[in-house]
């Protein structure tokens, strides 16, 4: 870590005292909207209970959906207590230049974070200082990553189709603190402008990690109200299962891969390493579709826009807490801006069982700053572990 040039977003070239940094982060996180906590993993942790611990690193699990650092801490009685502190997903850490090698077994670690609501031996890691290295925040960019070679390749395939193959990811969203003390998730490129007040939090584009505005049916509203966000039974991602082809595309900054293979397009979702196939040689869906998470997709090119029609879904969750039935129908339109290399996806979903109207949204991904990796999902939080809560 000490060989890396760390770009600090709060004060360039100055390391704030540990207590001052703690106070700043606590104030900002307390001011964040509740939805941001739900998406950012703080629901199981008490943001009103900051903790500061010093211990010896014993293990690091670099996995999705969350990585975990394990430390041995001496308590007030001199007894050794084993603790685990939750960090970001391995995919996000690697995108930020972090590595497993940073966490040297046997090294001393000073950690600032938040206490777990139920487990006294768990914490949410917000800042860390390992040995004599610099103190870093969980969202800090340790290396300036360059985007993949997607920007320097032919715009079209030999067939004439637009070339959208490659590894794609949403710009990283991290916590920024506005001058008035409010905090929220913002694109990494906007951190400085938000923290200086040049850009208001209200003008920041949403991450798209939650449900889109939609009028629900009586059944849809009732089931959304009863949805338990932190229950593996209700929330698929807590049991290492995909949520939906819409939600999983950008949630948590996953790196996805698109591969054009003539009569089909294969999409590998990086969040939980699931594959989806778009059939280009079919005018209609078959009648005997086996319902699944991804459904059955057929695509066609309208000029340079890829239009994808998908049906055949198994009942599930389109975006927590909104559920969908087997009648869900999604139409996506993928378009590429060759100047900015932004791959935009506009989508419209209908489901007469759960939606009164249309479920409409869009998202944007860019050439990824790290390659796609088929990370296994390994949910290590004890409260989520069940018979099928991890998938290798």
Language-model features and meaning:
Residues 10-11, 28-29, 98:
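Intrinsically disordered and other compositionally biased segments
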Residues 36-38:
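Boundary at the C-terminal end of the N-terminal hydrophobic targeting segment
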Residues 2, 33, 191-192:
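Position-driven detector of the extreme protein N-terminus
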Residues 19-34:
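Bacterial N-terminal signal peptides
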Residues 1-19:
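N-terminal secretory signal peptides that target proteins for export/translocation
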Residues 43-68, 72-392:
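PEST-like low-complexity, intrinsically disordered acidic/proline/serine-rich tracts
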């Amino acid at each position: 870590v000490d060989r890396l040039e760390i770009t600090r977003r709060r004060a360039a070239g100055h390391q704030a005292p540990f207590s001052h940094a703690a106070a700043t982060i606590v104030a900002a996180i307390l001011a964040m909207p509740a939805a941001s906590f739900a998406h950012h993993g703080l629901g199981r942790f008490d943001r009103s209970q900051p903790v500061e611990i010093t211990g010896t690193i014993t293990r690091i699990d670099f996995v999705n959906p969350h990585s975990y650092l394990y430390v041995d801490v001496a308590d007030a009685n001199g007894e050794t207590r084993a603790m685990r502190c939750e960090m970001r997903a391995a995919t996000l850490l690697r995108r930020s230049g972090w590595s497993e090698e940073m966490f040297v077994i046997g090294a001393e670690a000073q950690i600032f974070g938040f206490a777990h609501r139920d487990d006294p031996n768990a914490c949410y890691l917000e800042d860390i200082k390992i040995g004599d290295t610099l103190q870093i925040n969980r969202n800090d960019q340790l290396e300036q990553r360059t985007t993949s070679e997607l920007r320097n390749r032919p715009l079209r395939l030999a067939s004439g189709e637009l070339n959208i193959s490659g590894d794609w990811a949403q710009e990283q969203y991290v916590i920024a603190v506005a001058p008035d003390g409010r905090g929220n998730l913002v694109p990494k490129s906007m951190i400085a402008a938000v923290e200086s007040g040049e850009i208001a939090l209200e003008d920041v584009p949403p991450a798209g990690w939650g449900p889109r505005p939609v009028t629900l049916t009586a059944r849809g509203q009732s089931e959304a109200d009863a949805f338990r966000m932190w229950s593996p039974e209700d929330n698929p991602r807590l049991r290492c299962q995909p949520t939906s082809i819409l939600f999983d595309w950008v949630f948590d900054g996953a790196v996805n891969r698109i591969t054009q293979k003539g009569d089909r397009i294969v999409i590998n979702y990086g969040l939980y390493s699931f594959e989806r196939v778009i059939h280009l040689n079919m005018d209609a869906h078959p009648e005997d579709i086996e319902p699944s998470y991804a459904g059955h997709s057929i695509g066609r090119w309208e000029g340079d826009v890829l239009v994808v029609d998908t049906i055949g879904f198994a009942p599930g969750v389109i975006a927590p807490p909104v559920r969908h039935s087997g009648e869900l129908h999604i139409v996506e339109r993928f378009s590429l801006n060759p100047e900015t290399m932004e791959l935009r996806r506009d989508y419209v979903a209908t489901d007469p069982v759960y939606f009164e109207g249309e479920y409409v949204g869009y998202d944007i991904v860019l050439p990824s700053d790290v390659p796609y990796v088929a990370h296994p999902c390994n949910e290590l939080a004890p409260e989520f572990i069940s018979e099928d809560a991890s998938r290798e």
